[in-house]
Structures are given as C-alpha cells and as structure tokens.
Amino acid sequence: MNNKCKIINRRKSDRIYVGKVAIGNNAPISVQSMTNTRTTNISETINQILELQKVGVDIVRISIPNLKAAESFKEIKKQTNVPLIADIHFDYRLALQAIKYGADCLRINPGNIGNKRRVSEIISYAKDENIPIRIGVNAGSLEKDILKKYKIPTPDALVESAMRHIEYFDALNFNQFKVSVKASDVFLAIESYRMLGKKITQPLHIGITESGGLRNGTVKSSIGIALLLLEGIGDTIRVSLAAHPTEEVKVGYDILKVLSLRARGINFIACPTCSRQEFDVINTVNQLEKNLEDISTPIDVSIIGCVVNGIGESKIATLGLAGSHKKSAFYEDGVRQKEKIKNEEIIEKMEIKIRKKIDKLNNSKKNN
C-alpha cells in the first residue's frame, strides 16, 4: 500500500518522561498496563511485572490503596527495572509516600484526591523529585459538584474536571504532567479527548476504561483507541481488560501495529479459511503465534490456505506461504523459493524459517 495512505498527523504536545520513557512531542506511543495482584504480595507482583516486560510493556502502574502497599511498592521498585506509576486514590499522603519510595510517576484521580491544598502538597513533592503526574479523570468517579451540575457524565463534565486540576498545576508552575479523560462508553471517551486535546498541549494518556472481558474489551478498546490515534490524539495508551495484564499489552501493540504507529513482533496475515484451504490454517496460525510470542522484531508473515490470494500476499510479506496440494509454496522477501513445505510440517518448518529470518535481520542491523 502507498505509504501516503498510512500517514497520521499527530497532535502537537509537550514532552515529559516517565523514568526514561519519553511521552509526547512525537515520541513513540508507549504501551502501559497495570498489575492486578495484591501489591502487598511483593513476589507475585514482581513476577507479573516480569511477565509484562516479556511482552514489551513500557510502563507499569501499581495500585497503592494503603500505607502497607506503599511500603511494598518501595521493595518492588528496588527489584524491577521498568518505570512504575503509583496509582493513588482518596488519601493524598500515599502519593507523598510513593514519591519518597521511588515512583517514576503518580496517577491521581480528581474525583477523590481531595481539595486544592492536598493537590498542592503533592505537586510540591513531585517538583522536588522531578516526578510527573497523570491527572486521571474517570467518568465513574467525577467530583460531586460536577456530577450535580451535569447530572450524568458528559464530555463537558470530564473536561471540566480535568481543566480544574490543570489550573491548579498551572498556578503552581508545574508542567510535568499528562492527562486522561476515560469512560467505558466509547462515544463519551472519544468526544472528551477531542475537546480536551484542543484546550491543552500536555500529553494525553488514552484508553477506554473498564471495557470488559478479553473479546468484548478488545473490540471496544480497539475501536475507541484507534479512532483517537487516527485523529492524531494520544501519546501513551492502556487497553483496560478484565483479563491477564499481558493481554492488554499484546492488544495495545496490535492496535499500534495496524495503524503503522509502532511495530513489535510478527504481523501475521492469515485467511479466514474456506473449503479451498489445503492445510489447517487456523491451527497453524494459532500455534505459530503462541510459539513465537518471544519475537519482538517486526516482520510480516503471510499464511494463506490456497493460491487464490496466497501468491499475492506472499509477494508483499517478509515470509509467505501459499497453500497447495500436499506441499505449499514458500516465499522469502517476495520471491518464491525452490523449496516447498509439506503441509503436515508447516508449523515446525515455518517456525524455524521465521526464527532464522529474524536472526538474519537482527545481525544485519548490528553490522550496520
């Protein structure tokens, strides 16, 4: 496809850093997730963070519901090397402790963090340690006076909540922050981000909150996040799923991959199958995806069950397979190879060939 069709003009935004991860001002869109372990279970939380790192997470958020969790956060921070965000609600003092214990960023909720004095104290501590903050507005926890004014969560309500706290930050000359205005309703979230994006230059953390289980949540999040990204809105993302956090990261990268905003791992092109398929495409793709989850190098691999589209797709993929009777045609860099692969050996042989190609690409980069 003509690359001109893939250009997304991103919204101009300021640059902040969460740890060493740049956010905003055309930095690569970062993928976040959140642990769902008990923070006080230090070993379990660390293990989940390591799992998230294996699938490419850039930033991890951890809930700090009480002082004991804050103390656990301190130990977790010592034993991990990915930027950690302390998620704070209700008790502003926990934000102060999290900063003290090494948080790379704070998330505070305007709907429950308290009055201006409390926010000012958090900002003072964050300034001293050069720690950024996310103003995380959520449709499900708006301030009482705002909810009374608008009756129900609306884009105006979410944006007013965000702007109120942005004014606090501006008054204290604190500009190291990003903002989110999340809702579980896709239309509400999208319109809220559109409105906010026109008012401020700070980076925007985007997502559809509480989007549901793995299937429904993936669909809902993909639609909401992708629509915003296509409009150039969004500097960092989280796919919120009622599923294992690693699934959030995988879906996040898939969204960015589809939009050519960021690539990680293998992009499988696979047919939906019909009676023309010469081998079990569904099982083949599922097994290859599972076996090759560790791959981070971006390449396109086409697995098509017959020659109708198999040849054409293989010619534009890094590696391709066009199904044929008993043996299938194999392509590399668009060129058909002399070797054919027995259909019963496709999973094994293709995994070997993909890994070999990845090694070749990585070695070529090193030599250059």
UniProtKB/Swiss-Prot annotation:
It comes from the Bacteria. It catalyses: (2E)-4-hydroxy-3-methylbut-2-enyl diphosphate + oxidized [flavodoxin] + H2O + 2 H(+) = 2-C-methyl-D-erythritol 2,4-cyclic diphosphate + reduced [flavodoxin]. Pathway: Isoprenoid biosynthesis; isopentenyl diphosphate biosynthesis via DXP pathway; isopentenyl diphosphate from 1-deoxy-D-xylulose 5-phosphate: step 5/6. Binds 1 [4Fe-4S] cluster. InterPro entries: Dihydropteroate_synth-like_sf, IspG_bac, IspG_bac-typ, NO2/SO3_Rdtase_4Fe4S_sf. SUPFAM superfamilies: Inosine monophosphate dehydrogenase (IMPDH), Nitrite and sulphite reductase 4Fe-4S domain-like. One of its GO terms (molecular function) is 4-hydroxy-3-methylbut-2-en-1-yl diphosphate synthase activity (ferredoxin). Its cofactor is [4Fe-4S] cluster. Disulfide bonds: none annotated. Keywords: 4Fe-4S, Iron, Iron-sulfur, Isoprene biosynthesis, Metal-binding, Oxidoreductase. Its EC number is 1.17.7.3. The keyword 4Fe-4S applies. GO terms for biological process: isopentenyl diphosphate biosynthetic process, methylerythritol 4-phosphate pathway; terpenoid biosynthetic process. The keyword Transmembrane does not apply. [4Fe-4S] cluster binds at C271, C274, C306, E313. Converts 2C-methyl-D-erythritol 2,4-cyclodiphosphate (ME-2,4cPP) into 1-hydroxy-2-methyl-2-(E)-butenyl 4-diphosphate. NCBIfam families: ispG_gcpE (TIGR00612), PRK00366.1 (NF001540). PANTHER family: 4-HYDROXY-3-METHYLBUT-2-EN-1-YL DIPHOSPHATE SYNTHASE, 4-HYDROXY-3-METHYLBUT-2-EN-1-YL DIPHOSPHATE SYNTHASE (FERREDOXIN), CHLOROPLASTIC. Belongs to the IspG family. This is 4-hydroxy-3-methylbut-2-en-1-yl diphosphate synthase (flavodoxin). The gene is ispG.
